[in-house]
């Protein structure tokens, strides 16, 4: 059984914990409380399998605190990560400015592929859902960008996240197959 480690990173108050709870079907937190360090959620998704035989997959979703005071812990969090989801509040201009820093630290420095990264522009309830006006500069404009609004269309983000998990598992399976073939030859 494959086990994938996915990091949820991004600025403070971007909605990482709310999204993580929703996507892993964990309990809801109604009152805001900043994540201290990291919170690890383990889950399985019946829609994601590692091969045609339907072998299940396990996931660890690491909900990482967005405060800069945890920056010294980031290298340890990144160890053995298979994917990174950068969550930001699309309604806060400073979050957009921080995106390149999160991308550099969590995707470029550990040499992950862009396909292993997904951006989520999270819209908090009542904030409106302006999907059209978000333009990102290179290299962020090459990444998969998904808008989430858990109030208006919660299933859209769930389906996009399942697609993302499938791509991570496919990449892991291909890598494992290549490794097995190199051992046999």
UniProtKB/Swiss-Prot annotation:
One of its GO terms (molecular function) is GTP binding. GTP binds at residues 10-17, 63-67, 123-126. Coiled coil: none annotated. This is Intraflagellar transport protein 22 homolog. The modification Phosphoserine is found at residue 137. One of its GO terms (cellular component) is endomembrane system. The keyword Cell cycle does not apply. Keywords: Cell projection, Cilium, GTP-binding, Nucleotide-binding, Phosphoprotein. Component of the IFT complex B, at least composed of IFT20, IFT22, IFT25, IFT27, IFT46, IFT52, TRAF3IP1/IFT54, IFT57, IFT74, IFT80, IFT81, and IFT88. Interacts with IFT88. Interacts with CFAP61. Belongs to the small GTPase superfamily. Rab family. GO terms for biological process: cilium assembly; intracellular protein transport; intraciliary anterograde transport. It is found in: Cell projection, Cilium. Small GTPase-like component of the intraflagellar transport (IFT) complex B.
């Amino acid at each position: 059984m494959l086990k994938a480690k996915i990091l949820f990173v991004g600025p403070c108050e971007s909605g990482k914990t709310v999204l993580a709870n929703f996507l892993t079907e964990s309990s809801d937190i109604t009152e805001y409380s900043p994540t201290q360090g990291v919170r690890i959620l383990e889950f399985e998704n019946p829609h994601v399998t590692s091969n045609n035989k339907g072998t299940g997959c396990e996931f660890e979703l690491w909900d990482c605190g967005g405060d800069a005071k945890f920056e010294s812990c980031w290298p340890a969090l990144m160890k053995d990560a298979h994917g990174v989801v950068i969550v930001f509040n699309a309604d806060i201009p400073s979050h957009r400015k921080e995106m390149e820093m999160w991308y550099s630290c969590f995707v470029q420095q550990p040499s992950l592929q862009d396909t292993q990264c997904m951006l989520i522009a999270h819209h908090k309830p009542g904030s409106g859902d302006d999907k059209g006006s978000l333009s990102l500069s290179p290299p962020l404009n090459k990444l998969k960008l998904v808008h989430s609004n858990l109030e208006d269309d919660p299933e859209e983000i769930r389906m996009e996240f399942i697609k993302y998990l499938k791509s991570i598992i496919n990449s892991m399976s291909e890598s494992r197959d290549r490794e097995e073939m190199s051992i046999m030859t």
